[in-house]
Regions:
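Domain-level signal for soluble alpha/beta catalytic cores
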Residues: 1-184
Length: 184
């Protein structure tokens, strides 16, 4: 019920930061619109609508969109479709839970044949382990677009039933308790 209010507040704060530091580009974060670290199996229309609803609130205040921690090529392509009419550049953030596969079991090596990245600012692997960074950096270097990584400190990001149940129930729990905290 506070969706619009909180997104608008975040956008207004970002605009203030841009006013103070005009050389900084402001990203409008568009995370998974359902659960994170797992495939969104809802209908295309529902996913597109959810991404668009958030993007249209943020759009007047941001320079680009950050499509973040997406778990399948389908979800990423639907997010891109949702923001097309807003005419903003975007950064695509895909998640790799382990090895070189997204939670959808699609391989990083399949990006070129499943996504069009030429209109993007680039690609990043979001919320991945240092090990997954090492496993995937060479593959991303072959894409012909800017790329990067956002590392996290969890032991794993393959959700357990308790993770999904916690968030489905509307409960809030420290993710370190469910996903494990790395000690290195």
């Amino acid at each position: 019920e506070k969706f619009e209010e909180l997104n608008l507040k975040a956008a207004e704060l970002a605009a203030k930061a841009r006013d103070k530091f005009p050389q900084v580009m402001i990203a409008g974060g568009l995370p998974p619109q359902n659960l994170v670290y797992e495939v969104d199996n809802r209908s295309d229309d529902e996913i597109i609508s959810d991404f668009y609803d958030q993007a249209k609130i943020l759009s007047p205040y941001v320079d680009f969109f950050n499509l973040e921690v997406l778990s399948s090529f389908r979800e990423a392509n639907l997010a891109i479709k949702a923001i097309e009419e807003l005419k903003k550049p975007y950064l695509v953030g895909l998640h790799v839970s382990s090895g070189n596969e997204l939670p959808s079991q699609e391989k990083i090596s399949e990006i070129k044949s499943n996504m069009v990245l030429n209109n993007s600012l680039g690609l990043m692997l979001s919320c991945i382990s240092p090990e997954n960074y090492q496993l995937n950096s060479h593959e991303l270097s072959k894409l012909g677009c800017p790329y990067g990584f956002k590392l996290n400190g969890f032991e794993f990001t393959t959700p357990k039933l308790s993770y999904n149940k916690t968030y489905s129930n509307g409960d809030s729990v420290n993710p370190n308790l469910i996903l494990g905290k790395r000690e290195d």
